Amino acid sequence: TSIVPGDKLDITVAAKGGGSENKSKFVMLNPSDSIVDWVVNTVPSMGAGWCPPGLLGVGIGGTPEKAMLLAKQSLMDPIDMHELLERGPSNHLEELRIELYQKVNGLGIGAQGLGGLTTVLDVKAQDYPTHAANKPVAVIPNCSATRHVHFTLDGSGPAVFEPPDLKEWPDIEFELGEEVKRVNMDSLSSAEIQSWKSGDTLLLSGKML
């Protein structure tokens, strides 16, 4: 929370999953140590529990708790890596972001840890002055479900959010094939469950919970 002069509340909310939060990492490096090397060596140790592809937030400097806060705050920034790659870096933080983006994707971890070219969609970074003897570094991942909302309250009434247009999502067409078993969850029986075999393709309908 930052208190500034004015008569409005500017609010950013992130509904963050526990899987990615559990993979948060912190280290106190020596001043001569490489931030890039530490992050690249650390990401594989996170496994797939943070649900890649997602974002990495990197916080550098300050105190240990400040570095963690910087990493979390950086995840609130919009995804703009493609724009950054097109125009090129203009400062050391943008250079760091690009290098980490390329090297982490080069690890080949991929979606859900199953291998692939894309492990991170973007890398965010913020820094802060720190003691010359220290280099606190934090990295916090954000999963592929990046649920953010930003709104302003000015006293005129509650915030109103328009639901997204379903036309923004592409239509998915695929062939079901003859071997698909249609399962109605509303009338599912134990005998039907016992008839399933490993490798069966199930097409579910009805209420699951």
Question: What positions do the PLM features span?
Answer:
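Non-transmembrane, aqueous-exposed alpha-helical and coiled segments at domain scale
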Residues: T1, G6-V58, T63-F174
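Pocket-edge structural micro-motifs
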Residues: A15, M185, G206
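A generic local structural motif
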Residues: V43, S189-S190
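A glycine- and small/hydrophobic-rich beta-loop-beta segment
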Residues: D171-E175, S190-E192, M208
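Short, structured beta-strand/loop micro-motifs enriched in basic residues and often containing a Trp
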Residues: E178-L188
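Short, well-ordered loop/turn sites that connect or cap secondary structure elements
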Residues: I193-W196, L202
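Short, charged beta-turn/beta-strand-edge "cap" motif at the junction between a beta-strand
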Residues: T201, K207-L209
